[in-house]
Amino acid sequence: MSKVYDWFEERLEIQAIADDITSKYVPPHVNIFYCLGGITLTCFLVQVATGFAMTFYYRPTVTDAFASVQYIMTEANFGWLIRSVHRWSASMMVLMMILHVFRVYLTGGFKKPRELTWVTGVVLGVLTASFGVTGYSLPRDQIGYWAVKIVTGVPEAIPVIGSPLVELLRGSASVGQSTLTRFYSLHTFVLPLLTAVFMLMHFPMIRKQGISGPL
């Protein structure tokens, strides 16, 4: 094992990276409220794992979506547990994200030189809310259907471009298969990819600039 480690150490300088991570100074004022961002990240990772597991059984069609969710809950091995963890972790992620935003705002974490960190964090907050909207529609039950119909109908109040925007969101004039396909693609591919990109921007900036001062 030592030879394998030495081979990687010679090429990647693993020890230097580990020393940098473990020797980072943590200010004395840091408390549990400064962990809210990390908890949000943990919830996101749980979402990715449980969501990926459910893609093996979920069918994104208007005729099969609800039945496939029922199958996950009643027939698939540990399906009820995986979906329940996914659901509760989603709620926890939103709650932790909101509390994290409040903590950063109250401690002045958005001020110079951390403006870009704040901007990327706000984008991540919007993406988190988008996860909720798109995921809500996937079971294709009554609550999900009407929630999507209302949310996608909001832009219709915008003059001139309102109706085209609604049709762009839904994929057609009404909520149907095109809407479900769009939301499924957004929820399982587009939003996770964008979230990963902005996290890769967000965390290095925190690492570089350090934690903001006390309240």
From Swiss-Prot:
Positions of heme c binding: 35
Sequence positions that bind heme b 1: 100, 202
Cofactor(s) annotated in UniProt: heme b; heme c
Membrane among keywords: yes
SUPFAM superfamilies named among the record's database cross-references: Transmembrane di-heme cytochromes
Signal sequence extent: none
MF terms in GO: electron transporter, transferring electrons within cytochrome b6/f complex of photosystem II activity; metal ion binding; oxidoreductase activity
The protein's assembly and partners: The 4 large subunits of the cytochrome b6-f complex are cytochrome b6, subunit IV (17 kDa polypeptide, PetD), cytochrome f and the Rieske protein, while the 4 small subunits are PetG, PetL, PetM and PetN. The complex functions as a dimer.
Protein name, UniProt field: Cytochrome b6
Organism in which the protein naturally occurs: Lactuca sativa (Garden lettuce)
Lineage: Eukaryota, Viridiplantae, Streptophyta, Embryophyta, Tracheophyta
